[in-house]
Amino acid sequence: METFLFTSESVNEGHPDKLCDQISDAVLDACLAQDPDSKVACETCTKTNMVMVFGEITTKADVDYEQIVRKTCREIGFISDDVGLDADHCKVLVNIEQQSPDIAQGVHGHFTKRPEEIGAGDQGHMFGYATDETLELMPKCHVLATKLGAKLTEVRKNGTCPWLRPHGKTQVTVEYRNDNGAMVPERVHTVLISTQHDETVPNDEIAPDLKEHVIKPVIPEKYLDENTIFHLNPSGRFVIGGPHGDAGLTGRKIIIDTYGGWGAHGGGAFSGKDPTKVDRSGAYIVRQAAKSIVANGLARRCIVQVSYAIGVPEPLSLFVDTYGTGSIPDKEILEIIKEHFDFRPGMISINLDLKRGGNGRSQKTAAYGHFGRDDPDFTWETVKPLKWEKAQA
């Protein structure tokens, strides 16, 4: 039996880039909660003792940017210099301007256009992907790496492993078999965890704790064997972390946010962007399309691409590939997608309820992935029932 190895990585919420994603999305949530028509393009960067929020925002909302920055940092666990950042004493810089009037007139006509007339906020191409190898219809190695990162945070916050600090990274290599285009995970080949830790914890305590409290609850026993390789804090020391150890920037973890290297990526980041930005809304609708194709039994594996021009509502192109796993030809699946999904940005916002802020909705997406999550706020994960003419037996 021929197999191959494929690897996906993840980082948890204390990684500096992910801290920035969460701040940008917390700002978006605050704007949308008060003004669902807010136009937000919010970037964040951070380094030792400093967080800066900058970008273009047009909103009727009254937003305290500094308060949002400090609250987000505090919730993640950055509460003192020795963990990488002190939420209450770090410098917070804000440089926010209004959306360019040139963009505003082209995209939403300064708020005069009907939803179906709203153009894409920029050009670009986005991909959605789904695979039947997990219940989430997501790649196995990506799901496991993401869940390990989430578990690291959980056992830090609940006190199970009090020596843990916020910044952590995970990586999982899975041995796969190709079943006529569908991916079948056979076993976990390698598990890698690098996590920031307290200065006082001995190295010989870190590995057993990570195996017992992080790896065992996440990776099913059937995927682990005597040949599985574990690299647990292989650098030997990871005390300096967070923004003190590395600079952070919004939008630098786009593969972690999506499919862990599977499928494809158009390059656009998600966090800090309102639904007129098709980098985000376009990627959400093609995920729903790909997931619905697989969940309805039309294919075992599927990728969908959509592309846009700035100011134009209708997509320029749609593409589907089922990697040879389709139960009907791909050209017929493409017609089914066109029939069941509306790819115009204004209609995506309505159909996926993307203008709704509050409940930390966008901020939830900014750590541990935008896809494969079981949460009613992740409306794009809802499978659409698809109707098509089945071939007569």
Curated annotation (Swiss-Prot):
One Gene Ontology term of the molecular function aspect: metal ion binding
Cofactors demanded by this protein: Mn(2+); Mg(2+); Co(2+); K(+)
Domain of life: Eukaryota
Residue sites binding K(+) per the record: 43
HAMAP family: S_AdoMet_synth1
Residues at which Mg(2+) binds: 9
Pathway recorded for this protein: Amino-acid biosynthesis; S-adenosyl-L-methionine biosynthesis; S-adenosyl-L-methionine from L-methionine: step 1/1
Any one GO biological process: S-adenosylmethionine biosynthetic process
EC numbers, comma separated: 2.5.1.6
Function: Catalyzes the formation of S-adenosylmethionine from methionine and ATP. The reaction comprises two steps that are both catalyzed by the same enzyme: formation of S-adenosylmethionine (AdoMet) and triphosphate, and subsequent hydrolysis of the triphosphate.
Record NCBIfam families: metK (TIGR01034)
Principal EC category: transferase
GO CC terms in record: cytoplasm
Binding annotation for L-methionine: 56, 99, 246, 277
The protein, known as: S-adenosylmethionine synthase
Subunit description: Homotetramer.
Upper taxonomic lineage: Eukaryota, Viridiplantae, Streptophyta, Embryophyta, Tracheophyta
Tissues where the protein occurs: Root.
Co-factor remark: Binds 2 divalent ions per subunit. The metal ions interact primarily with the substrate. Can utilize magnesium, manganese or cobalt (in vitro). Binds 1 potassium ion per subunit. The potassium ion interacts primarily with the substrate.
Subcellular location: Cytoplasm
UniProt cross-references to CDD domains, sorted A to Z: S-AdoMet_synt
Native source species: Pinus banksiana (Jack pine)
Keywords, alphabetical: ATP-binding, Cobalt, Cytoplasm, Magnesium, Metal-binding, Nucleotide-binding, One-carbon metabolism, Potassium, Transferase
Recorded family membership: Belongs to the AdoMet synthase family.
Residues annotated as binding ATP: 15, 167-169, 235-238, 246, 252-253, 269, 273, 277
Reaction(s) catalysed (UniProt annotation): L-methionine + ATP + H2O = S-adenosyl-L-methionine + phosphate + diphosphate
PANTHER family (UniProt xref): S-ADENOSYLMETHIONINE SYNTHETASE (PTHR11964)
